[in-house]
């Protein structure tokens, strides 16, 4: 009977973006929507997704393979959701309270999330808050 490999699955949301992260023991490869992380064109997005790996250290990041699937929302919302899912997966994979504490001190939203949503547009207005100017005379 073959030994089943350990797979950790986590889920995260940011604004309208949703991300699922699958972590398995491996060689340190990270894929976002089946594209290697190294060839993602926007450097800001690439660095944001890499933050949990850099904080975890070379030993942990080189011993796992991560596949992140992101959908919905905009580019930075997707990056934040992917970062959060990856950080949660690394904490779950290692079972380390120290790593969890490092993430909380660095940026609490890596684990806890950010519940803010965009405010919806109201009727007879141009946007959520903007309205026609009122004239008194």
From Swiss-Prot:
Molecular function in Gene Ontology: RNA binding; structural constituent of ribosome
One annotated GO biological process: translation
Ribosomal protein listed as a keyword: yes
Classification via Pfam families: Ribosomal_S9
Keywords: Ribonucleoprotein, Ribosomal protein
GO cellular component, one term: cytosolic small ribosomal subunit
Keyword Ribonucleoprotein among UniProt keywords: yes
UniProt family annotation: Belongs to the universal ribosomal protein uS9 family.
Protein name listed in UniProt: Small ribosomal subunit protein uS9
Protein source organism: Sulfurisphaera tokodaii (strain DSM 16993 / JCM 10545 / NBRC 100140 / 7) (Sulfolobus tokodaii)
């Amino acid at each position: 009977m073959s030994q089943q490999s350990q797979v950790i699955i986590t889920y995260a949301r940011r604004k309208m973006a949703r991300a699922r992260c699958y972590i398995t023991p491996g060689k340190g490869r990270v894929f976002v929507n089946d594209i290697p992380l190294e060839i993602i064109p926007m450097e800001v997005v690439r660095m944001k997704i890499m933050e949990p790996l850099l904080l975890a250290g070379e030993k942990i990041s080189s011993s796992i393979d991560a596949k992140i699937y992101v959908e919905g929302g905009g580019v930075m919302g997707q990056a934040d959701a992917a970062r959060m899912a990856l950080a949660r997966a690394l904490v779950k994979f290692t079972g380390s309270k120290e790593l969890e504490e490092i993430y909380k001190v660095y940026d609490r939203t890596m684990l806890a999330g950010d519940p803010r949503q965009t405010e919806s547009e109201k009727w007879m207005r141009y946007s959520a808050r903007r309205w026609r100017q009122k004239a008194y005379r």
